[in-house]
Design a protein with these regions (language model features):
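Catalytic, metal-anchored helix/loop core of enzyme active sites in primary metabolism
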Residues: 1-305
Length: 305
């Protein structure tokens, strides 16, 4: 999740949002600039080596600054915090997710590793209204469940674009470059998630995330390649009905949904024009070529933390 996307909303939505605290690994200059722009009074940095960064001297005296993983997690306990958007990368985000829910705050979760690594620990603390997924696919599934009885869902259809290497053979994949892997056809993401998306590893992690979020088995989740990236995911019900969430591929939409729920705010994202779509394709993933997805499915079936 791009922090700049998130911070569009306090300016765009009058009196709805206030930035109370910000945390990052080591992006000191950026955090100081945002703290000054939004009047944020609490900062934390996971990397303790930035303690002496010159930019910190620009902060007002009433701004508290902490360093280390404990300082980042402590932000979730602040009295004036209502919702925590956790977009930390990797398993480092698990503690913030756990502490947020333990403190009774709303967790807007963009850190899938929290559930992949520790879903059995996190989910008992969550309710339907306190854990809101920010990943576009899981936000879509969440919205497809609204107004339904969960036990009447038959399966989840989890979509993916197929990445830049869709249709390639193993031999062809042995020749690809890092630059090609970083050229995702649909989403603008950080390098780690972009590479994981190219190998379909990220989609495998999303299956495990969905298992925990929606309390379903691995084999009740079908991954389907959808190159147009218009259908963000679907839920099929026992009566044969299928609810799908469609829209443009813009992360601002699921971010805003998590921040505004149970309401919907007007979005800066473009609106979808169905007349410009010649077709919507849905294909089986190549599990023999993209072994990362296969391994993730096996891990999901095995369970555990």
């Amino acid at each position: 999740v791009d922090l700049q996307m998130v911070l569009e909303y306090p300016d765009a939505v009058d009196d709805e949002l206030e930035v109370v605290a910000l945390a990052a690994g080591r992006r000191v200059d950026e955090m100081v600039r945002y703290a000054q722009e939004f009047g944020c009074k609490h900062l934390a940095f996971g990397d303790e080596t930035v303690r002496d960064a010159p930019a910190l001297a620009q902060l007002d005296d009433d701004v508290s600054v902490g360093f280390g993983a404990a300082a980042v997690a402590a932000l979730t306990q602040l009295d004036d915090v209502d919702i925590v958007l956790n977009a930390l990368s990797g398993e480092a985000g698990m503690r913030a997710s756990y502490d947020t829910l333990k403190a009774g705050r709303i967790l807007a979760l963009a850190n899938k590793e929290s559930l992949v690594v520790g879903g059995d620990l996190i989910m008992p603390l969550a309710t339907h209204d306190t854990l809101l997924p920010v990943d576009s696919e899981h936000s879509a599934i969440y919205q497809c469940y609204l107004g339904e009885f969960a036990n009447e869902a038959l399966r989840i259809w989890l979509t993916c674009s197929g990445g830049p290497f869709r249709g390639m053979t193993r031999d062809e994949l042995s020749q690809v470059t890092a630059a090609q892997a970083l050229a995702h056809p649909t989403w603008n993401m950080g390098p780690k998630i972009t590479v994981d998306s190219a190998t379909l590893m990220n989609k495998g992690l999303e299956v495990i995330e969905a298992q925990h979020l929606f309390d379903v088995k691995t084999d009740d989740i079908r991954v389907v390649v959808h190159p147009q990236s218009c259908v963000h995911s679907m839920v099929e019900y026992v009566d044969g009905s299928v609810k799908a969430h469609l829209g443009v591929a813009d992360m601002r939409i699921p971010i805003q949904f998590a921040l505004s729920y149970p309401h919907r705010w007007e979005s800066p994202a473009a609106q979808v024009d169905f007349t410009q779509m010649a077709s919507l394709e849905f294909l089986d993933p190549d599990l023999d070529t993209f072994r990362c997805l296969t391994l993730a499915l096996e891990a999901g079936r095995a369970g555990g933390t």
